[in-house]
């Protein structure tokens, strides 16, 4: 990949503050299939009446959705801790958490271990205020509208609108949650294994966020990928791949014992 192409790719990529809106396996497949890493240069296209009307409906429902989440948290027992240094977002694989404990000095009494994809799991540790929820929802709606008008193809716009209610309410709640963590300790570190919308919420709350890969990586779509503080991978080829496509995160290779006796080892796949 040429340096010139890489620079063009980065320059025309969706700004990091808006990428959370595009988190969707369907959108990612479309972007990668079309090799559409970058957006049209002209912003502020006019939305069709159908898209505008449906998006307005989604926005209205989003206010009811976050109010429901606000009330729901009071029916869940909170195990709040005075000081938090780490939050591990468990993606359900098991070995992703093991990687975190192996690499970093984690203190269990100052750590939240959260099921990354369950809002109820976040509610077990912190409660969020309705004012902050509402403020973040309004900001999220603005972000969503900006992306809708960026000039993506109609199939991507349709998916954006279809996923709007889920993405708006989920991201809004997560961002408000991570702001609570930041207020407790701005030096808290978030560890995750590619939980994308959760990562965006943490990063945009100004928290250091580390992505721990548990296996070989696939192709990365820069329009969706979060700007992690650091990334851990298994091979130098993966490290070079991230560096070549213009990812600005610090990329590290997992430490390993060098194999010098090639004729006395068995590798199991």
Regions found by a protein language model. Name each.
Residues 252-269:
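Conserved catalytic-core segment of nucleotide-activated headgroup transferases in glycan assembly
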């Amino acid at each position: 990949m040429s340096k010139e192409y890489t620079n063009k790719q980065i320059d025309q990529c969706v700004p990091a503050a808006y990428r959370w809106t595009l988190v969707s396996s369907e959108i990612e497949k479309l972007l990668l299939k079309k090799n559409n890493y970058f957006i049209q240069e002209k912003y502020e296209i006019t939305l069709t009446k159908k898209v505008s009307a449906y998006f307005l409906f989604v926005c209205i429902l989003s206010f009811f959705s976050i109010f429901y989440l606000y009330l729901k948290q009071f029916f869940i027992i909170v195990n709040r801790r005075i000081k938090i240094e780490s939050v591990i977002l468990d993606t359900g694989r098991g070995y992703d958490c093991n990687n975190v404990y192996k690499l970093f000095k984690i203190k269990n009494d100052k750590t939240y271990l959260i099921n990354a994809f369950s809002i109820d799991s976040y509610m077990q540790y912190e409660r969020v205020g309705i004012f902050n929820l509402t403020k973040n929802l309004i900001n999220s709606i603005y972000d969503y509208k900006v992306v809708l008008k960026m000039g993506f193809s109609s199939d991507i716009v349709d998916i954006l609108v279809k996923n709007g209610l889920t993405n708006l309410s989920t991201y809004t709640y997560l961002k408000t949650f991570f702001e609570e963590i930041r207020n407790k300790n701005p030096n808290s570190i978030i560890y995750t294994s590619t939980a994308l919308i959760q990562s965006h919420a943490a990063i945009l709350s100004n928290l250091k966020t580390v992505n721990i890969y548990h296996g070989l990586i696939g192709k990365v779509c820069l329009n969706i990928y979060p700007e992690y503080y650091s990334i851990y991978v298994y091979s130098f080829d993966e490290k070079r791949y991230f560096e070549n496509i213009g990812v600005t995160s610090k990329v590290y290779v997992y430490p390993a014992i060098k194999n010098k006796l090639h004729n006395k080892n068995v590798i199991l796949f």
